[in-house]
Amino acid sequence: MKRTRLENTPCPAGRALDLIGDWWTLLIVRDAMRGISRFSEFQRSLGAAKNILSTRLKALVAEGILKVEPAADGSAYQDYVLTEKGLALQPVLVALGQWGSEYLFDEGEACTLLVDNKNRQPLRKIEIRAQDGRVLESQDITAIIPEV
């Protein structure tokens, strides 16, 4: 079955998933946030086939999520570096990871924990807040399409 493209939907989540919804793509962004920058490092970390990894990296560069720079160590390699647009995905990955650790691991099962570098304490759970600071639940939110 052919996948439906969502690039023209008025739903921001649909458009975002159209771009980054593939799990290899999000794992590449996750690894880039952890400091991985070379093709070989991504491949070693992810175990992705070279053609899949190459296709995903090219797409992330084309969409402005990653940029290609000369290797920081002066070698002939190139580094894939997150752009501002790519770095803006951090809350998405943190929220996804927090959801996964809460719902997809058994009690006592080893699970990666995100901690604050300064004090080594776990991150607080991401919350959705109103303009006035109130924490919002799903029933407190409505999606609208503003008139243009």
Map each language-model feature to its residues.
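A detector for short, charged/polar N-terminal pre-domain segments
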Residues: 1-7
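N-terminal helix-turn-helix DNA-binding core of bacterial DNA-binding proteins
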Residues: 11-52
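Basic, amphipathic "hinge/linker" alpha-helix immediately C-terminal to the N-terminal HTH DNA-binding motif
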Residues: 21, 72-93
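C-terminal regulatory/oligomerization modules of transcriptional regulators
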Residues: 94, 98-148
